């Protein structure tokens, strides 16, 4: 096993906050470029889908307050900021990712910290969103409890994650791309090759569909649904407090 794959395997097992933060600090300079390249630009569409659902939910609110957790370079926060009257806050553990987010979106407020213990008051937000980040939480169950805690009654969490297709043929093609092609392409542009060995393994290890909605309900959400997107290569979870 290569040192890159060994590092990725170790990170999957520990999900150490400091190691995750260091990984994202390292990939920050090429993160946006590779995200769009490796998803063929479809990642932008997935964010729009989540923002449209959130917009419908907060319709009638004069100033909907939205928290985007694991905001990274801020793209999902920016999609949410297009909701009329929205006041959006981005939150992430990586200072390097946040530095890019602040340059890209100076009108959005960004804060640094860990999802498992957020500095926001109970019932502060109408919406909590997270794009491609919750599978990296050191303590997933505690992170979801925090999502629930900071939401207002009736508020919703919108969580986007990669999905392994259930169709056998699609699954086989997806895993070939994810495990063999993607890391090689990423290695041409990013100095952190292990991050793209970590990615497919983290997706495989993450509880998918019904398994994750069960965790959301255990965190206190009264309703949790999922919506597969783009041939089941991505999935949107919507959880209602």
UniProtKB/Swiss-Prot annotation:
Q: Which family does it belong to?
A: Belongs to the class I-like SAM-binding methyltransferase superfamily. MenG/UbiE family.
- Residues at which S-adenosyl-L-methionine binds: 73, 92
Q: Which SUPFAM superfamilies match?
A: S-adenosyl-L-methionine-dependent methyltransferases
Q: Indicate the segments annotated as coiled coil, or none if absent.
A: none
Q: Which UniProt keywords apply?
A: Menaquinone biosynthesis, Methyltransferase, S-adenosyl-L-methionine, Transferase
Enzyme class per UniProt: transferase
According to UniProt, the name of this protein is Demethylmenaquinone methyltransferase
* GO biological process, any: methylation
Gene name of this polypeptide = menG
Instruction: State whether keyword Methyltransferase applies.
Output: yes
Chemical reaction(s) catalysed: a 2-demethylmenaquinol + S-adenosyl-L-methionine = a menaquinol + S-adenosyl-L-homocysteine + H(+)
Enzyme Commission number, as recorded: 2.1.1.163
What's this chain's function?
Answer: Methyltransferase required for the conversion of demethylmenaquinol (DMKH2) to menaquinol (MKH2).
Instruction: Tell me the InterPro entries matching this sequence.
Output: SAM-dependent_MTases_sf, UbiE/COQ5_MeTrFase, UbiE/COQ5_MeTrFase_CS
The protein's annotated pathway: Quinol/quinone metabolism; menaquinone biosynthesis; menaquinol from 1,4-dihydroxy-2-naphthoate: step 2/2
Keyword Transferase listed? The answer is: yes
Report the GO molecular function annotations: demethylmenaquinone methyltransferase activity
Q: Which HAMAP family match?
A: MenG_UbiE_methyltr (MF_01813)
- Give the superkingdom in one word: Bacteria
Look up and give the organism this protein is from.
Chlorobaculum parvum (strain DSM 263 / NCIMB 8327) (Chlorobium vibrioforme subsp. thiosulfatophilum)
